[in-house]
Amino acid sequence: AEKIKICLQKQVNSSFSLHNGFGGNLYATEEKRMFELVKPKAGASVLNQSTWIGFGDSRTDKSNSAFPRSADVSEKTADKFRSLSGGSLMLSMFGPPGKVDYLYQGCGKHKVFYEGVNWSPHAAINCYRKNWTDIKLNFQKNIYELASQSHCMSLVNALDKTIPLQVTAGVAKNCNNSFLKNPALYTQEVNPSKEICGKENLAFFTLPTQFGTYECKLHLVASCYFIYDSKEVYNKRGCDNYFQVIYDSSGKVVGGLDNRVSPYTGNTGDTPTMQCDMLQLKPGRYSVRSSPRFLLMPERSYCFDMKEKGLVTAVQSVWGKGRESDHAVDQAYLSTPGCMLIQKQKPYIGEADDHHGDQEMRELLSGLDYEARCISQSGWVNETSPFTEEYLLPPKFGRCPLAAKEESIPKIPDGLLIPTSGTDTIVTKPKSRIFGIDDLIIGLLFVAIVEAGIGGYLLGSRKESGGGVTKESAEKGFEKIGNDIQILRSSTNIAIEKLNDRITHDEQAIRDLTLEIENARSEALLGELGIIRALLVGNISIGLQESLWELASEITNRAGDLAVEVSPGCWIIDNNICDQSCQNFIFKFNETAPVPTIPPLDTKIDLQSDPFYWGSSLGLAITTPISLAALVISGIAICRTK
């Protein structure tokens, strides 16, 4: 009889790369980065489709006769906007004659404003003021600020008021022989007498706590008054000095102008200019006192519930060729912390006409159709990778990637994986540091590792039989390192908050620190991933070694009395008793079934954070249990000896 020895032998050649891990090493035919770099998409997007609302005009108005050619958004996104062609929030606030007057109201955690162009220099609104850009800037800034602190907002288009009997609603020649709806102009018709100027005006208005279904915790009110260049211009009838002042219920001055105590401009001119300051006022009863002849009475407000902080996106709103625009929206964005601006790079070129349906704007606003994982001034991201090539400009919200270089992202083994023995990778002398990770976060943190060091992560689980680390202990190592990473990050945030408290007066210092912190977080995360990679490699190596023994056991069972196992993974067979077909049945499963495999490697890692990026406690979660790579028959050679 001819006896032969058949063994399982792992095939490794120069095409394999070696990967070291905690508890075991691997040879692999391929490797891949744990994450790829992502690139943000320019424009606007939202974190949650169910929690945002838009405020717009004809470019988001589905009722426009030229829709969808007139729109800069999709039909789906247009449904989320409160819009009317020709409208704007400021037009509805002041109500100039002949302009669209739309009741803007709605609720959402994230508010997108794409309006404003309908009140611009092209509109040529006069009413005692030819250039309203500075008032528009102040108005938009206050709208964005209050919207970022509220869930709901609404125009209040009719305030309760008490008007003095001696005044009547007036008009003005330089306001199309009409006047604004807010403020309303009231005048006194005075017959020649000793009191030729009439009497001082005293009126009252009430800011409600609720308007329809909308709760009002704070109102935006326009406090308007005339500015005279000199006392003589106003005092043509011997009316003394001009004043128009608003008082709260306690008698405190909250807005207006009083030339009895404040100087006139000193300029030369015969026509006054109207100025409107934006006041943030609580609900309640207010009084207005003015000098005789004129009374400018607040008639409208925007009310805000101030229930939750939210996100605000302002979209640049400009005309196409031939019409003059302003940049109040852009400037208001710069003045509003946490506000994101979507800005064109090219002139507006419309499809429906010169001013409606711009392709660039459609691309910039296309992200509103989707949910993003991260939105920022640099753009939006919906990929799951935690890294991007460039630093994302703040503000940013959601699960935003950190800046990193591609070569710094750890690589993991892929393709055909073959374990080493494992006996040469046991940690016998624990270290007191993990990759110096305590130095990664600009000296803010110190990581105290238990006396067992790395061995503590593997719970000191050396196999009694001599080599390797158990799969169970490696999995426990994942749990332990995950907990320590959470502690590390919690300590980071506490230190960051303390530093922020110390330098809140210095905005540039905050910006510099923010960048430093983000860079440190990126470095720390890369360090954490390096640890996880090493645990992954060790865990897979251990599992693959176990799978080899399982395969050997299966072969022994199939062979029965036809083969004798003389050492782990080696059998003696009588060639005369068990021919080639017999051997194929035993060792190749008669090629009718593959060698039992284990599920493929899944290294998906999900970085979780609060909806608001800064100050959040980042958490690291392995979303699925780490599984083992498949062993295929082509990865095993059968070595025969006589």
Swiss-Prot record:
Glycans are attached at N13, N48, N131, N176, N382, N539, N590. Residues 297-351 are annotated as: Esterase domain-2. The chain crosses the membrane at residues 618-638. It is a single-pass type I membrane protein. The active site is at D353, H356. Residues 639-642 are cytoplasmic. Its main location: virion. It comes from the Viruses. Residues 1-617 are extracellular. InterPro entries: Capsid_hemagglutn, Hemagglutn-estrase_core, Hemagglutn-estrase_hemagglutn, Hemagglutn_influenz_A/B, Hemagglutn_stalk_influenz-C. It is an enzyme of class 3 (hydrolase). Belongs to the influenza viruses hemagglutinin family. Binds to the N-acetyl-9-O-acetylneuraminic acid residues on the cell surface, bringing about the attachment of the virus particle to the cell. Plays a major role in the determination of host range restriction and virulence. Class I viral fusion protein. Responsible for penetration of the virus into the cell cytoplasm by mediating the fusion of the membrane of the endocytosed virus particle with the endosomal membrane. Low pH in endosomes induce an irreversible conformational change in HEF2, releasing the fusion hydrophobic peptide. Several trimers are required to form a competent fusion pore. HAMAP family: INFV_HEMA. This is Hemagglutinin-esterase-fusion glycoprotein. The gene is HE.
